[in-house]
A protein has these predicted regions:
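Short, Lys/Arg-enriched N-terminal segments with co-localized hydrophobic residues
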Residues: 9-22
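Mature N-terminal segment immediately following signal peptide/propeptide cleavage
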Residues: 46-87, 91-97, 642-644
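Repeat-blade elements of multi-bladed beta-propeller folds
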Residues: 52-56, 88-110, 134-162, 194-219, ...
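Extracytoplasmic/lumenal domain signature
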Residues: 73-84, 111-132, 149, 163-193, ...
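Extracytoplasmic electron-transfer domains, predominantly the class I c-type cytochrome c fold
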Residues: 197, 279, 501-520, 524-527, ...
Length: 770
């Protein structure tokens, strides 16, 4: 590939915004007396508002509030104003506040409306357990839309393969929307599976609801086409093919007819809208399978790209690909951030994209031209059979990375390890390959940032007027080793006990006839498909624990969840009935299939993935690996928040994102290992968050200095909401995180465990003065 300075293509128009809305009449008898007047933020200038109408702060995804009552001078007085119990289960949804009503996910995944001043329940909208409608507890947020005259107000949520429209005042389904209030997320997708998931609610723009999707992680996943629907009717308005069709730009960056069988290239994270210009910016994810690409030779547009489209029509404007032919799962997913900066003596509107590889890419918002040069540099090549990686990758030349991009034996953190483990890990790391763009192979590779980032969901924001962008990120390595598809994959996935993660292929498994065979086959599917989220011991990791799921839901309930998806979990329709039965056997009696007992063979391969089209000859080989997350083996900080001044391209400060007290006493913060929460930026000069160790932090926006900490009832997930009711400013957190420390991992000497408190929504505010 020739050396180039930037990779954008230009096809730009300027737009003015004028909404066109149908008027609908709804009863508002439930609306409580004394509602405050509310101005919806409709643009990227952050205008004063009293609510939080978007789960990441606004169409610009800034996490920014213009409210100034809570300041650096008084934040130490912050206290609990009210609490509302969320109920059992794992919750990851961010709240909304419109006027003085807070909307949260609670009570077994119901949509619940609360009085935002008191936390008193106004109404709830439960989701039935049948038909894939399993509740919104694990969705990352909700969407709000209103007509010009505010007579029609809707909450839009996704769950179980559907988008639902709910009356924001009454909690009733909007019967005129699509099929009696619900829209099938497969609509418009040619190669749709049984069900298609979305972990985010999309974004509203004028009379449109724009949606991404989550297609799953396997070979031959469905495509991640971007779609926009009429918010009144649910009718499909436009679609953009992220895997191009013949005649579309980027088609030649794939093998011929790749759109017929390749998948992924989805938008599973947050995206951003420049309302004034009518431009929507998407962080587009990697192609699937994301860690091996013999079936997708080429650069694979628009995978791993920042993609700008006309929000009204879906017309292509420009793109920049951050990773060519991704085999590291380095897809961007944090929301692109909008800011206005002084550059070369002129004011420039920019868009900045944090990525999982640790780089921040900054562009002119209109033209797509990089603000500073981005160079193509040679990188190591893959030695896997059939693989053809890109000879170069793009590197920003001015803006420093926000995450660590290399790890050696010298970076080994031994605080959690026994002397035996220290020796074992040093030997293991000394033999492994490393490097930011070193492809995974048949021997172990240390990848940092690992496959979960770097930058991941919920973790970026901006003070646009100051040209400041804030990025939350993780320093979590992955240790990857590819094995042929069908062989067993086993990873420590956060544990430290030496497990020798080599593959253990077993011949002809079903012929063995052992009583434990279904559970062992189920473990194999679990390790390849479920373990990254639910942990190697079923105790939960990024997802909920599954050690009691069969007794709670019953075999039929588990089968339904696997096929339909539930909350943040996508559906897995490619696993046929026998494979699902094997998984249920393992979940029911995991003692029959202890670690290392997973088996493989032709039957397993048939269980997990479909085959390629019959006319694809020769069929490419397949390799797989686990995610290999090893968060506790690298020296801290394990996560950080980084503040950039984009007027200069320099880092202003970097501060650990919370702490991990299980690592023992420390005079400095070390960050959380797997934070699941986001921060908010207050116009008064604060950055505020609750970490996964039940601690609230308030940072000085200018310096990153910790100004105040206090205990919180539980660890946080999602992005808090900042709002004002009756002249009082509140910060509402979803404190529903549960235990944050990896199950089964011993504490360091002097370490203190953080018990999980009650799952609840907690609003903090300053005391009422008399």
């Amino acid at each position: 590939m020739p050396r180039r300075r930037y990779g954008a293509t230009y096809d730009i128009r300027h737009y003015s915004s004028e909404k066109e809305n149908k008027m609908h009449t709804l009863r508002s008898h439930i609306f409580v007396a004394g509602l405050l007047a509310f101005a919806v933020v409709n643009g990227n200038a952050q205008k004063p508002a009293t609510g939080w109408t978007d789960y990441v702060g606004g169409p610009d995804s800034s996490h920014f509030s213009p409210l100034k009552q809570i300041t650096p001078a008084n934040v130490s007085k912050l206290d609990v104003a009210w609490t509302f119990p969320a109920g059992d289960g794992f919750y990851s949804s961010s709240p909304l506040v419109i006027d003085n009503i807070a909307y949260v996910a609670a009570k077994h995944g119901a949509l619940v409306a609360l009085d935002a001043a008191t936390g008193k329940e106004l109404w709830s909208h439960p989701f039935a357990s049948s038909g894939g409608r399993a509740g919104i507890s694990q969705q990352r947020g909700m969407n709000y839309w209103e007509s010009k005259d505010r007579s029609d107000r809707r909450i839009l949520v996704t769950t179980g393969g559907y988008l639902y429209a709910i009356n924001a005042l009454t909690g009733k389904d909007v019967d005129s929307f699509s099929d009696h209030g619900k829209l099938d997320l497969k609509t418009g997708i040619d190669r749709a599976p049984i069900a298609l998931a979305s972990r985010t609610p999309g974004r509203t723009f004028e009379n449109l609801i724009i949606l991404g999707s989550f297609t799953g992680e396997g070979y031959l996943a469905p495509p991640g086409d971007i779609r926009a629907f009429d918010v009144h009717t649910g009718k499909l308005v436009w679609i953009f093919h992220t895997i191009p069709r013949p005649g579309e730009m980027g088609y030649d960056s794939w093998p011929k007819d790749a759109y017929k069988y390749m998948g992924g290239v989805d938008v599973w994270g947050e995206f951003t809208i420049d309302v004034k210009r009518g431009i929507v910016y998407f962080p587009v994810a990697s192609a699937k399978y994301e860690l091996y690409g013999a079936d997708r030779h080429g650069n694979n547009l628009y995978a791993d790209s920042l993609l700008a489209l006309d929000a009204r029509t879906g017309k292509y404007l420009w793109h920049f690909q951050t990773v060519h032919h991704d085999v590291w799962d380095y897809d961007p997913n944090q929301a692109p951030q909008l800011a206005t900066v002084r550059h070369n003596g002129k004011m420039v509107d920019v868009v900045a994209l944090p990525s999982k590889n640790g780089f921040l890419y900054v562009f002119d918002r209109v033209t797509g031209k990089p603000l500073w040069p981005i160079e193509e540099r040679p990188v190591p090549q893959s030695d896997l059979p059939g693989e053809k990686t890109s000879p170069t990758q793009p590197f920003p030349t001015v803006v420093p990375p926000f995450a660590r991009q290399n790890m050696t034996v010298n970076d080994l953190y031994t605080g959690f390890m026994t002397p035996e483990e220290v020796v074992w890990w040093k030997e293991r790391l000394s033999k492994a390959k490393s490097g930011l763009f070193t492809p995974p192979g048949l021997t172990e590779t240390i990848q940092i940032p690992g496959v979960t980032g770097g930058a991941s969901f919920f973790g970026s924001g901006a003070d646009a007027a100051k040209g400041m962008v804030f990025v939350e990120s993780k320093n979590v390595p992955s240790i990857l080793k590819m094995v042929p598809d069908g062989e067993s994959i086993s990873t420590n996935n956060g544990g430290l006990i030496p497990s020798r993660i080599d593959a253990h292929p077993q011949p002809n498994p079903r012929a063995a006839g052992a009583a434990s065979l279904p559970a062992r086959l189920g473990r194999t599917i679990y390790e390849q498909t479920c373990q990254v989220c639910h942990g190697p011991d079923l105790k939960g990791d990024r997802g909920p624990a599954l050690d009691t799921v069969v007794s709670r839901l019953g075999p039929d309930g588990v089968r339904k969840v696997i096929h339909n998806g539930r909350g943040a979990m996508p559906p897995f329709p490619s696993i046929p009935s026998q494979g699902v039965s094997d998984v249920i056997a393992f979940l029911k009696q995991p003692d029959l299939a202890p670690p290392g007992s997973a088996v493989a063979g032709n039957t397993l391969t048939e269980h997990i993935e479909p085959d390629y089209p019959a006319n694809l000859v020769p069929k490419p080989p397949r390799y797989k690996t686990g995610y290999g997350q090893e968060g506790y083996i690298i020296t801290p900080p394990w996560s950080t928040i980084t503040a950039y001044n984009l007027n200069t391209g320099k880092i202003m400060w970097q501060t650990p994102y919370g702490d991990t007290p299980q690592a023992g006493p420390s005079d400095t913060l070390r960050g959380n290992v797997f934070p699941r929460s986001g921060f908010v930026i207050l116009a008064s000069g604060l950055v505020v968050f609750v970490d996964n160790q039940s601690k609230l932090y308030a940072l000085d926006q200018k310096t990153g200095k910790v100004l105040f900490t206090r205990d919180a009832p539980n660890g946080a997930v999602g992005v808090p909401a900042v709002y004002e009711v009756g002249g009082r400013e509140y910060i509402l957190f979803a404190l529903t995180g549960g235990p944050a420390f990896s199950a089964g991992l011993r504490m360091a000497p002097g370490g203190v465990n953080t018990p999980a408190g009650p799952k609840s929504y907690v609003a903090f505010a300053l005391p009422v003065t008399k």
